[in-house]
Each structure stands twice: as structure tokens, then as C-alpha cells.
A protein has these predicted regions:
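Glycine-/acidic-rich phosphate or pyrophosphate-binding loops and their flanking alpha/beta elements
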Residues: 29-34
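An amphipathic alpha-helical core segment
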Residues: 156-163
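Exposed alpha-helical structural elements
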Residues: 3-7, 11, 97, 137, ...
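Acyltransferase
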Residues: 147-152
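Structural alpha/beta surface segment adjacent to cysteine/selenocysteine redox centers
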Residues: 48, 54-146
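Single conserved hydrophobic/aromatic residue that forms the stacking wall/gate
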Residues: 164-173
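Local sequence-structure signature of Cys/Sec-based thiol-disulfide redox active-site neighborhoods
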Residues: 36-55
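N-terminal leader/targeting and pre-domain segments
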Residues: 1-28
Length: 173
């Protein structure tokens, strides 16, 4: 049935999703950022046991060199399996896909299978302690050790990160 509420809902949804409205919101946000003299921010969501994160982390430093941005890494955990249509197929595909494409990005991907939970937890604990400015370089090393199954290297990194990383802005709070 086509009712007045139907027409009103369609009008509201069209206004909400319009490209012009999107641009207005973007322009207001950009004007606000400039008025507050804030740099552009890039939020990078990193999942240590995600094969695509292994590829992406190799380009963080290049990205930061190319653009004047404030880089904010955020570690994420497991996704809700209910959100994935076929969770097993998805994880299998991700792993196989990265094995196939890593060489095209000049990235060494040593993973043959997903890392053990113990290694994933160790990698997360290391990256949690890292200053955002050092995240790219440390995360590359951590990721390679994780996907290689190298517990000794992760333990070595954990000790060195805790001893030698500069204080995080979170520590100043």
C-alpha cells in the first residue's frame, strides 16, 4: 500500500542518502577541521591474524610519507561469525588470495595457515605497546614473525618494544 508515510519515508531516505547532502556534510567537517587547525586523520584498523592486514602494513610508512596525515592505528579482534555468510570459506579464501597476490605487491607472505591463538595474543600485546608513529615499522616485523610462526622472534620483539618504545600519548593521560 502506498500511503502518505510511504512517500514521506522515501523522501526522507532520498534526502539522507543524496550526494549533495553528503558533500555538504563533508564540506562542513573540513571547514571545522581547518578552523580548529587539526591535521587530517587516518584511522587504520589492523587485525594481526588477517592476511590482508599483513599486506597493508607494508604500505603504511609509504602512505605517511606521501600524505600529511595523522595516522591512528586501531587493533581489532575477531569479527562476529554471524556477519559472514560462510565464515570458513571466507577465511580460506582470504588466506589463499593473499598467498597469490603478495608477490605482486613485493611483500613476502610466509603464512601457510592461520597462526595459533597464543601467537596472535603475543602479537597483539606487542602492538598495543607501540607508539603510533612507530606502528608501521614494528607491525611489519611482528606480522612477519606471526605468519612465520616464530614465537622466539615475537618474544624478543615483546621485550624490545617494552624496553625501547617511546611513551605512547595514551600514557600521558
Amino acid at each position: 500500500r502506498r500511503t502518505f508515510a510511504y512517500k514521506l519515508r522515501n523522501k526522507a531516505m532520498n534526502m539522507f542518502s543524496s550526494f549533495e547532502n553528503f558533500n555538504l556534510i563533508r564540506e562542513k567537517a573540513e571547514a571545522s577541521r581547518k578552523a580548529e587547525n587539526r591535521p587530517h586523520e587516518v584511522l587504520y584498523f589492523h587485525k594481526v591474524d588477517d592476511p590482508y592486514s599483513h599486506l597493508t602494513v607494508h604500505y603504511i610508512d609509504k602512505f605517511k610519507e606521501a600524505y600529511d596525515v595523522q595516522f591512528k592505528p586501531i587493533l581489532v579482534g575477531e569479527e562476529n561469525p554471524a556477519a559472514l555468510h560462510e565464515p570458513t570459506l571466507y577465511t580460506d579464501y582470504c588466506l589463499e588470495d593473499v598467498k597469490r597476490i603478495a608477490s605482486y605487491y613485493d611483500v613476502d607472505f610466509p603464512g601457510k595457515s592461520y597462526p595459533e591463538k597464543k601467537l596472535v595474543d603475543k602479537a597483539n600485546s606487542i602492538l598495543t605497546a607501540v607508539n603510533p608513529d612507530e606502528f608501521g615499522s614494528v607491525a611489519k616485523t611482528v606480522s612477519h614473525a606471526l605468519w612465520s610462526g616464530d614465537l622466539a622472534k615475537l618474544e624478543e620483539l615483546e621485550v624490545s618494544c617494552l624496553l625501547y618504545t617511546s611513551p605512547s600519548p595514551r600514557d600521558e593521560l
